[in-house]
Amino acid sequence: QLIKNNGSTTLEFREKLSSVAFTETAYYDAIISNYFNKISSTLFPTKKIFYGNLIEKPRYGENPHQQSAIYSKNLRMNLKQIHGKQLSYNNYNDIFAALTISKSLPKDIGTVIVKHANPCGVSIKKNQLESYKSALACDPVSAFGGIVSCNFKMTKNLALELNKLFLEVIIANGFDTNALKILKTKKNLRLIDATDLVFKEILRFTSVNEEI
């Protein structure tokens, strides 16, 4: 800029740098503010500051004409995608709706099916295949194009059964080698390994027009 403009900078350039500088200082202050709210058990402070790092920009928002972005308090999301095309905004909504349920199930073999952030079926059985089939039986029509979330490491027999239905995303606490080989035959199917994902009790923020 200095060379290009004979030792000076444009107003547009200075405004851009100001935006970067104030964003960084505000981000730092927000972390401190939220920390003190937390240790003082202030659940609903008079002013709430939201902060996060830009993680990803999905192709579009809830609808094709809308934009969206994914932010996280961490430098990356603790969500490991191991196969398939890019996650969409709606995929993220469905994934966390499914995980909210599956991560809260007992440590038995549980399966959750979600479509448009609504549960279509939930089941706990003695083996993986029974668990999935029981969850699917709750609403087999709505399950088409939905998301399956399992609280166990997936094996071959369930993978073969899942491949019979069109699904957007499959989530599990890991996949064995044979299950991965089978599921990866569908190049667009998104596979999520949620083994290390820990769910905590959190406040949920809902936007209404420009309000929260």
Locations of regions flagged by a protein language model:
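N-terminal beta-alpha lobe that positions the nucleotide/phosphoryl donor
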Residues: 1-44
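ATP-dependent carboxylate/acyl-activation modules
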Residues: 27-32, 36-212
